[in-house]
């Protein structure tokens, strides 16, 4: 049997040696040729023992051909759908007797050959419709011209074809073990561990094998190329390969066959018009999110743990054994599993009028419950975010009544209802963990537990007023009379904004500071917000040194809030 690597070479060969049998495969030359994928790209001739890729426009058939020169030849043809179900059939036409005997070596005139050839639809050997990887296998095939016709009726599609006359020795696809199932051996909220039996192709035959795991949320895949096709969807139209050279009546004449004129022109007309129509009507397909499907190749390990999954989510897992020498793969029987739910968090009970300290992990959540004993008309909720911003959600008897991002101190007024219960959810930021102080109260009027803050909590330093032993700073106040305490701390020359940001915990009060760091405390307010500014000169500093200044405002109940820290430096020479 001979399957040539290109149509042009095949026609020249037959023209030159009309009366002789086609030569058998030169293995050394074949191995060199199959490495050159361009020789087989979009060719209508199927090479012996090499996998080729193709592309179909919807409703537009493609035909591939090969010749088996001797009777009783083993034959294997495998078709792998990638994007969509395919319909394919394999037919056989016997070689004309005058082409199989010994000849003079001189080609006959073309017109005379046409008169000797009659149209023949051939014998149908195998048909299939679906998206499985399917094969035609025969231990003893007759000689003749074989035609493989493929069509996709759903959409434009990629596919792969492999065929060989030496299936016993080639074995390009990794062999599945006796138990080809993928097992889930461990299941967590964000992790799944998979295990499978190794392929004998690697463990027994010593072929180079690696395993690739595909994870997605939709369904299992029957081939690796189907998974890769899903991953490679673009934000633009799918790009098809350029049309290649198809067989013409001239080619068939020298094989000893010719299709009828009507069939040939009808196919040409339908192919051209369908292809044009499909090019114009192909739909825009958005690219799936990266997280929706992943492919991870892990070498020759047969146990693998997938991490960073979402809790309470169903995933589908497929394992493919890939022969890295041939780049051909075989699918194990895939599986699916649902990750475990998030552990239900303990709900913290809030007491009326009492401050509760809360810690929330990075990107984590904490739930608080407030159930006033007496009937109430209003609930006042104070939230003091000490570090990064947090999201606050409040539900009253299951109904969402508040959803806000909170930085610093915020106060919310919620309308009350008799016997109402409130569920408060605090969600941490992506940056880091959060510490909060939370207070809920039904008591109307009275002094507030947290001090009022101005919109701007920065401390301003006056550069022109710096000396070798003092600095002058200012900060904004409010219309509420509060106590302000100033603290200083000497820091190194390398101390920068990153250090300051890391230490910016607004909930740490003056009680956390050393007595030696205290500068002063004073009361301050202004009925006119435009004039609610106070200044202070801090003395007793050393020349050329850096200091971190902090201002704390203390509320009536003793709760304090820290302004943004300020880094200052005294003059070195005066």
UniProtKB/Swiss-Prot annotation:
Which superkingdom?
Eukaryota
What residues does the Fibronectin type-III domain cover? 174-329, 451-560
The record's subcellular locations are: Secreted
Task: Share an example GO biological-process annotation for this protein.
Answer: embryonic neurocranium morphogenesis
Kindly list the GO CC terms recorded for this protein: extracellular region
Segments crossing the lipid bilayer? none
One family from Pfam that matches here is: NDNF_C
Ordered alphabetically, the record's keywords are: Glycoprotein, Neurogenesis, Repeat, Secreted, Signal
What SMART domains does the entry give?
FN3
The protein depicted here goes by the name Protein NDNF
Q: What organism does this protein naturally occur in? A: Danio rerio (Zebrafish)
UniProt lineage: Eukaryota, Metazoa, Chordata, Craniata, Vertebrata
């Amino acid at each position: 049997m001979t399957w040539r690597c290109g149509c042009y070479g095949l026609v020249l060969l037959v023209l030159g040696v009309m009366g002789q049998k086609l030569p058998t495969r030169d293995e050394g030359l074949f191995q060199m040729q199959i490495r050159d994928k361009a020789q087989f790209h979009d060719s209508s001739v199927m090479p012996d023992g090499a996998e080729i890729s193709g592309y179909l426009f919807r409703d537009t058939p493609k035909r591939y051909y090969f010749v088996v020169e001797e009777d009783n030849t083993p034959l294997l043809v495998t078709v792998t759908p990638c994007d969509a179900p395919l319909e394919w059939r394999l037919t056989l036409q016997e070689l004309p007797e005058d082409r199989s005997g010994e000849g003079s070596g001189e080609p006959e005139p073309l017109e005379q050959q046409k008169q000797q050839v009659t149209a023949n639809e051939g014998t149908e050997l195998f048909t299939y419709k679906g998206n499985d990887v399917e094969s035609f296998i025969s231990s003893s095939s007759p000689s003749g011209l074989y035609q493989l016709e493929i069509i996709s009726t759903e959409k434009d599609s990629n596919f792969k074809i492999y065929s060989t006359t030496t299936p016993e020795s080639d074995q390009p696809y990794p062999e599945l073990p006796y138990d080809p199932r993928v097992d889930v051996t461990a299941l967590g909220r964000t992790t799944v561990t998979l295990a499978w039996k190794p392929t004998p192709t690697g463990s027994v035959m010593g072929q180079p094998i690696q395993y690739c795991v595909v994870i997605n949320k939709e369904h299992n895949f029957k081939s690796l190329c189907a998974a890769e096709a899903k991953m490679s969807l673009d934000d633009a139209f799918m790009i098809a390969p350029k049309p290649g050279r198809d067989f013409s009546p001239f080619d068939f004449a020298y094989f000893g066959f010719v299709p009828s004129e009507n069939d040939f022109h009808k196919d040409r007309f339908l192919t051209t018009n369908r292809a044009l129509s499909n090019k114009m009507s192909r739909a825009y397909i958005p690219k799936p999110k990266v997280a929706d499907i992943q492919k991870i190749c892990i070498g020759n390990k047969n146990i693998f743990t997938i991490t960073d999954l979402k809790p309470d989510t169903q995933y589908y897992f497929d394992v493919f054994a890939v022969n890295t020498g041939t780049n051909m793969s075989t699918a194990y029987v895939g599986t699916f599993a649902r990750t475990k739910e998030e552990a239900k968090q303990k709900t913290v009970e809030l007491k009326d009028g009492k401050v509760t300290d809360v810690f929330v992990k990075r990107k984590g959540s904490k739930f608080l419950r407030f159930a006033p004993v007496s009937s109430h008309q209003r609930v006042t909720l104070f939230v003091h975010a000490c570090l990064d911003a947090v999201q606050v959600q409040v539900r009253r008897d299951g109904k969402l009544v508040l959803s806000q991002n909170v930085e610093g101190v915020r106060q919310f007024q919620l309308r009350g209802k008799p016997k109402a219960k409130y569920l408060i959810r605090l969600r941490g930021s992506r940056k880091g963990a959060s510490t909060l102080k939370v207070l809920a109260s039904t008591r109307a009027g009275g002094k507030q537990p947290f001090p009022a803050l101005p919109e701007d909590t920065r401390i301003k330093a006056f550069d022109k007023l710096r000396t070798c032993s003092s600095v002058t700073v200012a900060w904004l106040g409010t219309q509420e009379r509060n106590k302000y305490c100033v603290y200083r701390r000497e820091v190194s020359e390398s101390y920068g904004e990153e250090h300051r940001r890391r230490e910016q915990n607004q909930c740490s009060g003056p009680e956390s500071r050393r007595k030696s760091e205290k500068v002063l405390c004073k009361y301050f307010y202004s009925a006119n917000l435009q004039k609610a500014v106070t200044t202070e000169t801090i003395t007793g500093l050393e020349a050329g040194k850096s200091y971190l200044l902090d201002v704390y405002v203390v509320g009536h109940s003793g709760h304090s809030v820290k302004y943004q820290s300020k880094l200052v430096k005294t003059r070195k020479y005066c």
